[in-house]
Curated annotation (Swiss-Prot):
This is Probable nicotinate-nucleotide adenylyltransferase. It holds the Pfam family CTP_transf_like. It comes from Prosthecochloris aestuarii (strain DSM 271 / SK 413). The gene is nadD. The lineage of its organism: Bacteria, Pseudomonadati, Chlorobiota, Chlorobiia, Chlorobiales. It comes from the Bacteria. Catalyzes the reversible adenylation of nicotinate mononucleotide (NaMN) to nicotinic acid adenine dinucleotide (NaAD).
Length: 203
């Protein structure tokens, strides 16, 4: 079974998260997509609780699976103590699915800081990495890729053009300031946020 791993705080999940997952399902040879909800140690005042973030991640998975069941939520990072590191999550995935190939899905911003990740070279040795980048960022990414020393195989990193710019931070700000936001998140998540007054003065 071929696995893909997509991690994040999902505070909240939004349409770019959904589009990325659907894109990965269509373009990559994967059988299961694991959505891992990470710890949020730098929690802001208007960040949602772990329980809410987990519930919204489940709604994201339902949106993904509406057109073909492939995704599931992992709460392992939330249930362990301490900060979240991708290398530790990969170790856990390897315990659950020994010998199964894993593809790590990341956005362009994360790739720019990839060399600051804990054990980043080991990550490249243990899984494939797919970077979703903006179409106009080719030169910058080619340069960043060229300066990653110690890559065991140049084919371990693949780039996919993905022109869908959204951030959870911007959505939280929009909600807090009373701006429209429902068009930025899947409908089920918009309903969840509204019914629980998340990220607003009433939360």
């Amino acid at each position: 079974m071929r696995l893909a791993l997509f991690g994040g705080s999902f505070d909240p999940p939004h349409n770019a998260h959904l589009a990325l997952c659907l894109c990965a399902r269509e373009l990559l040879d994967i059988d299961k997509l694991i959505i891992s909800v990470s710890n949020n140690p730098l929690k802001e005042n208007r960040s949602a609780s772990n329980a809410h973030r987990l519930a919204m991640a489940e709604l994201l998975v339902s949106e993904i699976n509406a057109t073909g069941r492939i995704a599931e939520v992992s709460r392992w990072e939330l249930e362990r103590s301490g900060p979240s590191y991708t290398i530790d999550l990969l170790t856990r995935i390897g315990q659950l699915y020994p010998e199964e190939p894993v593809t790590l899905l990341i956005g362009e911003d994360n790739f720019r800081g990839f060399r600051q990740w804990k054990s980043w070279q080991e990550i490249l040795e243990r899984c494939y990495v797919v970077v979703f980048r903006r179409p106009l960022e080719h030169a910058a990414f080619d340069d960043a890729y060229a300066h990653l020393p110690g890559i065991p195989d140049r084919h371990q990193v693949r780039f996919i053009d993905f022109d869908f710019q959204l951030s959870s931070t911007a959505i939280r700000y929009a909600i807090a300031t009373g701006e429209p936001y429902a068009h930025l998140v899947p409908p089920s998540i918009a309903d969840y946020i509204a019914s629980r007054h998340l990220y607003s003065e009433r939360s």
